[in-house]
């Protein structure tokens, strides 16, 4: 054989090796386990479209940032893991995506559906574009603690996935934080729906959607971010989200038709902002529940909370925003005193209780909130109390100023510290939420200066003379609350179809649509320096009202014949809502 021929043969062998290593389709569990065993950085393992039963994967591999190890479906949504299936990931830079978990049987509830640990923790690992659908144990197992996703390690991500029909004790996504090491996890663009409680709402703990931390390590910081998630028809316990660590952020989430509250149970220095809560008067529903120190709570919209329990009594832990008393010498799993917390520029609409200050879940909770700022909140048509002071705040820095209510009563003195009451005109309404209107007493009424208050709940800029409440009049933001029409479009399983997650996030940042809300004849769309391509506009019923290709990075669209209402604009793989008035 000549040297040239030998070289060609070797080239072919190398090419075949690379193909078999980097891009292989497997159709049996044995082949899958073999492919995982042989995987190296850059390997992509593709699962053949079919139903897989009792798949039990234990992955211990190291990828890199530029060459992760990927396990994916041949066709997203056409690979089904059933029976007693689970995935354990250990190592670094592993991506698991596109799989549906359904039809469970003979589950071992001690083993999570997906755990970011095998023989060691997983760091820089991603679970994306999956669906876990009613993957529950038997009735006899419903009080067993069965977690769907157990986070460990650092810098991990759960995104663009749907978690539907959880029943039984155990978080959907849980980070127990067994150590005090910072996590830097990101949980975003997920859909959490149709959880049902064991017994009545709040009969048992550990029925939340997301829990970050545990009481034992709660005084250490996690730096986890939970954003752009949609919670729908969700009922488990008082904590829809349970924060039990420090320096976490919760923003741009929508809670719709739910029971419970976003609860800062333990930990300090968290931020809760730009979230929408639509409780629909469900019993035992709240907005944000506060314990601990140094939290910032701003730009949240909370509507229709109902503090009644199923038995008709009133819960001390609910309300639009509930600030708890603390317990002297509190143990880590009890109630730390609220200190140095700012509750600023929130909008509370049609709740029974708007703001509840100094509540007592237990009679031993006798420490009043200290150095509490409650400022520039809009409280609209609350039926029981706009502001309830069960225990008055203490500390020289405590102040309540610049709050505005429309009708109803409150436990503060009207016309003191710019706290005012009006009888009408504070807010208007559309099909989605109540918003600030021309002539409102909230316009330019903000008091004080807050470095964190740079935009409003919709993402529009705050002016120097800023408005009271969560929204700035005509600021042009487009971060509207999620609805059912967003599932598989902007949140949840099926969202990430062709682009990488980094590409989608960049497009979301670059895509600009203005003016919002639009009251004129022209809608402007821009995509930085990228070509727009196909632009689609649909109404909330999913009907396509415009589809046009633009070979430019900017476009003007004639909307003068559009009816008033909310529409979805889709450019490439990114969708945003707009309101036309």
Predicted feature locations:
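Glycine- and acidic/polar-rich repeat regions and solenoidal domains
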Residues: 83-88, 102-124, 132-413
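Bacterial Sec-dependent N-terminal signal peptides
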Residues: 1-25, 501, 568
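A glycine-anchored, Pro-Gly-centered beta-turn/N-cap motif
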Residues: 50, 92, 154, 563-566
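Right-handed parallel beta-helix/beta-spiral solenoid domain characteristic of secreted/periplasmic
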Residues: 24-27, 49-55, 62-116, 129-140, ...
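Surface beta-loop-beta hairpin patches that serve as ligand-binding interfaces in beta-rich domains
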Residues: 440-503
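Short, T/G/N/S-enriched strand-turn elements that build extracellular solenoid repeat scaffolds
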Residues: 32-38, 53-63, 82-87, 243, ...
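C-terminal outer-membrane/trafficking sorting elements
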Residues: 503-581
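Acidic Gly/Asp/Thr-rich repetitive segments characteristic of extracellular carbohydrate-active
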Residues: 22-60, 64, 458, 545
């Amino acid at each position: 054989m000549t040297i040239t021929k030998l070289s060609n043969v070797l080239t072919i062998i190398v090419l075949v090796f690379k193909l078999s290593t980097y891009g292989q389709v497997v159709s049996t569990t044995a082949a899958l386990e073999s492919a995982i065993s042989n995987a190296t950085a850059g390997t992509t393992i593709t699962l053949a479209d079919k139903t897989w039963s009792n798949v039990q994967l234990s992955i211990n591999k190291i990828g890199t940032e530029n060459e992760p190890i990927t396990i994916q479906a041949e066709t997203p949504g056409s690979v089904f893991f059933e029976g007693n299936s689970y995935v354990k990931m250990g190592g670094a830079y592993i991506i698991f995506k596109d799989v549906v978990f359904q039809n469970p049987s003979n589950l071992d509830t001690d083993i999570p559906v997906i755990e970011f640990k095998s023989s060691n923790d997983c760091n820089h690992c991603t679970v994306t574009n999956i669906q876990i659908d009613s993957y529950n144990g038997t009735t006899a197992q419903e009080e067993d603690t069965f977690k769907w996703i157990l986070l460990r390690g650092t810098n991990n991500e759960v995104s663009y996935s749907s978690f539907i029909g959880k029943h039984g004790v155990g978080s959907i996504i849980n980070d127990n934080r067994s150590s005090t090491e910072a996590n830097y996890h990101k949980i975003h663009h997920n859909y959490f729906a149709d959880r049902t409680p064991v017994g009545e709402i709040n009969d048992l703990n550990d029925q939340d959607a997301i829990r970050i931390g545990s009481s034992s390590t709660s005084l250490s910081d996690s730096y986890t971010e939970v954003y752009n998630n949609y919670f729908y028809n969700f009922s488990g316990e008082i904590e829809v989200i349970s924060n039990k660590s420090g320096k976490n952020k919760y923003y741009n989430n929508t809670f719709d038709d739910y029971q419970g509250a976003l609860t800062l149970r333990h930990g300090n220095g968290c931020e809760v902002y730009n979230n929408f809560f639509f409780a629909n008067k469900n019993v035992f529903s709240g907005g944000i529940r506060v314990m601990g120190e140094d939290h910032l709570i701003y730009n949240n919209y909370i509507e229709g909370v109902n503090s009644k329990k199923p038995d008709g009594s009133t819960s001390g832990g609910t309300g639009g925003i509930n600030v708890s008393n603390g317990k002297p010498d509190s143990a880590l799993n009890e109630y730390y005193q609220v200190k140095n917390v700012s509750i600023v520029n929130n909008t509370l609409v049609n709740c029974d209780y708007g703001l509840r200050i100094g509540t007592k879940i237990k009679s031993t909770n006798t420490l009043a909130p200290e150095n509490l700022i409650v400022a520039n909140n809009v409280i609209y048509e609350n039926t029981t109390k706009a502001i309830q002071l069960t225990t008055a705040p203490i500390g020289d820095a405590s102040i309540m100023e610049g709050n505005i209510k429309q009708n109803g009563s409150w436990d503060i003195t009207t016309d003191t510290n710019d706290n005012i009451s009006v009888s009408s005109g504070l807010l208007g309404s559309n099909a989605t939420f109540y918003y600030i209107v021309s002539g409102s007493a909230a316009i330019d009424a903000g008091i004080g200066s807050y470095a964190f208050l740079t935009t409003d709940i919709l993402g529009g800029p705050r002016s120097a003379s800023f408005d009271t409440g969560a929204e700035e009049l005509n600021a042009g933001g487009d971060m509207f609350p999620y609805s059912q029409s967003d599932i598989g479009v902007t949140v949840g399983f099926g969202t990430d179809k062709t682009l990488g997650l980094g590409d989608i996030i960049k497009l979301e940042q670059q895509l600009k649509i203005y003016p919002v809300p639009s009251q004129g004849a022209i809608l402007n769309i821009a995509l930085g320096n990228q070509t727009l391509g196909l632009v689609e506009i649909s109404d909330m019923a999913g009907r396509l009202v415009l589809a046009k290709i633009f070979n430019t990075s900017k476009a003007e669209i004639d909307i003068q014949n559009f009816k008033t209402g909310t529409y979805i604009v889709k450019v490439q793989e990114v969708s945003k809502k707009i309101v036309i008035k």
